[in-house]
Every structure is written in structure tokens, then in C-alpha cells.
Amino acid sequence: MPRLFIEEGFDQVGPLYCVKSKHREGVEFINQDLRSEVPTCLFDLILCRYVAFTYFASALQCKVMARMFERLRPNGYLVIGADEKLPAIVPEVVSLNGQPHIFQKIGGLQSAKRNFRREQRTSISLLD
């Protein structure tokens, strides 16, 4: 990583580097078991490198992939490992600038409306 990025983005704490607090504001870091848990919110960016598409069986890869794209906002990004491949073609997803491991969910107005309605239902059910 370029030295400038390290200086601007991280604080050194002993031998470790921590993301500066100004960059953590408004960001939610979640550690979950992809095989069973599904986040309840929508994401702009999902980083899933060298886990699901490397070690899971193909049926489970498809299930996890579907869950990820369901929870990804329209125009959001999924980044997988450089040596990984998605197990299936996803119609609403394109490879970003020809990068085989960076994907963008393309969703027009209909997709955005579906996601908005889904968020509304989730919010209402949480209040019940």
C-alpha cells in the first residue's frame, strides 16, 4: 500500500495498523457466518474474499451469492478474491471495468422500488 494511503488512513498502534476513526464513521463492520446468517440491512459494498467462493460447495456458493446480491443496494459493489469466480451468472450484475472480481449491481428504478418496499416491510415488522 502506498505510504501516503497508510499515513492518511491508518493509525499505528504498536505493530498493528487501525483504520482512523474519521474513516470508520458511518461504516458498519459486520462479522457473520455466511452459511446461515443474513444481515437485515442493505449495503453499498460487500467484501467477501477467499471464503465463500473458494471453500464452500457449489450449491452453498449459489445460495450465499443470492443472499449477498439481495442485500446489495442498486449500484452497490461486491468484491471477491482475485482468483475467485461467481458460481453463476447474475443478470443484474456487471463486472466493473472488466475486473473479474469486482462486480456492480445494476438495477434500474424497478429494482430500487423492490428494495425500498422490502426495507419498508422490514422496518414495519421491527416495530410490531
Residue ranges, per PLM feature:
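SAM/dcSAM-binding transferase cores
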Residues: 22, 43, 111-128
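A short glycine-rich, Lys/Arg-flanked "PGG" loop and its adjoining helix->strand segment in the class I
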Residues: 61-74
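Short, solvent-exposed loop/turn segments at secondary-structure boundaries
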Residues: 57-60, 91-93
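Extended basic-aromatic, gly/pro-enriched interface segments that bind polyanionic ligands
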Residues: 1-47, 51-57, 86
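Conserved Class I S-adenosyl-L-methionine
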Residues: 1-20, 85, 89-116
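Conserved beta-strand signature within the Rossmann-like core of class I S-adenosyl-L-methionine
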Residues: 74-82
